[in-house]
Amino acid sequence: PADANGDISRSSTNVDEDISQFAVDNNFQADFATGDISHTVLLGLDHQRTDTSYLAIFGDGGTTNIFNPVYGQPIVRPARSTAFYDYNQKTVQTGLYVQDQMALDNWRLTLGGREDWVHQGTTYFNKNDATNTDRSKNFSGNAALSYVFDSGFVPYLSYAESFQPASNASVDPLQSFKPTEGKQWELGIKYQPPGSNTLLSAAVYDLTQKNVQVTSFQSGGASVTDQTGEVKVKGLELEAVSDVTENLKIIAAYTLAKSEVQKGEFKGNRLQLMPNQQASLWNDYTWHTGALDGFGIGFGARYTGNTYGDQANTWAGKANAYTVFDGAVHYDLGRLDNSLKGASVKVNATNLFNKDYISTCDGSYCYFGDQRSVVASATYQW
């Protein structure tokens, strides 16, 4: 903060990140039956390589006065030898997976499993080229059971495990981050009225993750990535997709999430950057006759509840809820001329009214959300 005279200290940040990735996925599907049970079996092997170079230098930004600011002051870039982060990380991951979707009358059962092998090596250029190598493997399974009623209702119960290698490096070259592992139970119901283009769904879930990556900030602006012991998230998800009329389509969604750190220094606090509520609504109206045949417009809103950007859940780390609006226009060029069938153009705008809002705070700084963005695109389908 500024002192009584209005003088304020500043810091400088220089971040340079380069990521390259190669990924390939091969799978084989077989459909067959064993007695009255039909099977769809998927067997696959995937492989990916990721190469990440990350440099972060934090330094002094000089001082200025908020009542009489001087712009254009030169800022000396700190030497690379003083970098807070300066590393190269290579990750190689191979996964073998299998899944069987079974059907017997109105019953549906899915069973699956995946084995992952990961090798990760990190070289710290700011720590005398110290290296850290980690190898890990993990099995994760999934299962789901549902019943398809003739009336359109489909209740289901599912269980899934997850495994994700760490994507950042620790400040300490002697400490490597562990992969993030998770387990989730979900109980829900879906409903599609027979003969309609409407789908309604509701679900409650219980997710537990360990070794979740979090970020904290030090004086001078340096951000430090760490891992928290265990996190639990319980929530409710509602979604509705409906072709209300031949012209009007509506998509609505709502999520309620209660997160809590289960282990570690900040036990009992909310998970960093996890909104307690989220909601969205999108409406699209397309003309199919008349002078506007093929032309459509869309309009919607997105609501994001409050978040804490720091692990301690302090007042300074809290960002309030916000709502932004989006819009779109699109046109089917095939309605203009039959030779253009399959071609269309579209313009999307996010944060349509260019609202200024705070998206996150980390206890030291707050950050504005994205300004209005307008993207035009052309597509062709055949």
Give the location of each predicted region.
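Surface-exposed loop/turn segments flanking beta-strands in extracellular/periplasmic regions
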Residues: 2-8, 54-85, 131-132, 183, ...
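Residues that define the transmembrane beta-barrel architecture of outer-membrane proteins
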Residues: 18-22, 90-94, 135-139, 181-185, ...
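Structural signature of Gram-negative outer-membrane beta-barrels, strongest in the C-terminal barrel
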Residues: 19, 35-42, 46-48, 87-209, ...
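Residues on the lipid-exposed face of transmembrane beta-strands in outer-membrane beta-barrel proteins
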Residues: 24-30, 96-102, 143-147, 187-191, ...
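Short loop/turn motifs that connect adjacent beta-strands in outer-membrane beta-barrel proteins
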Residues: 32-41, 106, 150-152, 194-197, ...
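Conserved C-terminal beta-signal and adjacent last beta-strands/turns
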Residues: 40-41, 157, 185, 272-382
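Gram-negative outer-membrane beta-barrel transporters
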Residues: 106, 206, 226-311, 356, ...
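Membrane-embedded beta-barrel scaffold of Gram-negative outer-membrane proteins
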Residues: 155, 179-243, 250-255, 259-262
